[in-house]
Amino acid sequence: MPDRISKETFLTNIKDGIIVSCQALPGEPLYSPEGGVMPLMAKAAEEAGAVGIRANSVRDIKEIQAVTDLPIIGIIKKDYPPQEPFITATMAEVDQLAELGIAVIALDCTKRQRYDGRPIEDFIREIKRKYPNQLFMADISTFEEGLKAFEAGIDFVGTTLSGYTSYSRQQEGPDMTLIAELCQEGIPVIAEGRIHTPEQARQINELGVAGIVIGGAITRPKEIAARFIKALKD
């Protein structure tokens, strides 16, 4: 198992760089029941100069760890209907990820009702008590959610879910306003969500973020192709 990385070291490693999200869910073209695809994506990202990887599932994370030493932000996506949160939604997923020795565990920290019925602040405090040396990232959709998670003890706040909750800003590109507001509050922000172009990434970096995660624009060829095709048709 890799040594735990300190918050300071992680922040230094990801500064002015790109973390690449390498994920594919069942039903998507790059998903393979046998695995083996995401580590190829991760290796390509590393060769391009990526400073980290975001990955989903124990299987994919282990396969990625076998091919790269880049720090990993890990999640487990699992539905708990009728509740909406599905990104590392319960302690069971946190426990599985903690065993992998990854740099950061990310989890849904929105205000939506949770499967366990508990306020998210209570859950954050519990996971920090249980795993005091583990870094955690809050996936949020609004400024209030980010502030609440940070005040509860979360290490990093990600703008991952802006536009993916019914009450958050709905827009085509990244939520620059949310990113700027969180940075101005002095919160370590990992910008993520609908960052489609290098220019957008550069603009976000200039806002003073701790890090940037890019997924669909790099590792989802179906989405990338669709964007080009739509541009020609429009």
UniProtKB/Swiss-Prot annotation:
Q: Name one GO cellular component term.
A: cytosol
Q: Which family does it belong to?
A: Belongs to the NanE family.
**Superkingdom in the source lineage:** Bacteria
Keywords for the protein's UniProt record, in alphabetical order = Carbohydrate metabolism, Isomerase
PANTHER family attached to this UniProt entry: N-ACETYLMANNOSAMINE-6-PHOSPHATE 2-EPIMERASE-RELATED
Pfam families cross-referenced by the UniProt entry: NanE (PF04131)
Q: What is its EC number?
A: 5.1.3.9
What's the protein called, per UniProt? Putative N-acetylmannosamine-6-phosphate 2-epimerase
* Database matches in InterPro entries: Aldolase_TIM, NanE, RibuloseP-bd_barrel
Q: Is the keyword Isomerase assigned to this protein?
A: yes
The record lists the catalysed reaction(s) as: an N-acyl-D-glucosamine 6-phosphate = an N-acyl-D-mannosamine 6-phosphate
Role according to the record? Converts N-acetylmannosamine-6-phosphate (ManNAc-6-P) to N-acetylglucosamine-6-phosphate (GlcNAc-6-P).
Q: Which NCBIfam families match?
A: PRK01130.1
Tell me the organism: Streptococcus uberis (strain ATCC BAA-854 / 0140J)
Protein's pathway: Amino-sugar metabolism; N-acetylneuraminate degradation; D-fructose 6-phosphate from N-acetylneuraminate: step 3/5
Q: Which GO terms describe its biological process?
A: carbohydrate metabolic process; N-acetylmannosamine catabolic process; N-acetylneuraminate catabolic process
Among SUPFAM superfamilies, the record links this protein to:
Ribulose-phoshate binding barrel
Q: What are the protein's GO molecular function terms?
A: N-acylglucosamine-6-phosphate 2-epimerase activity
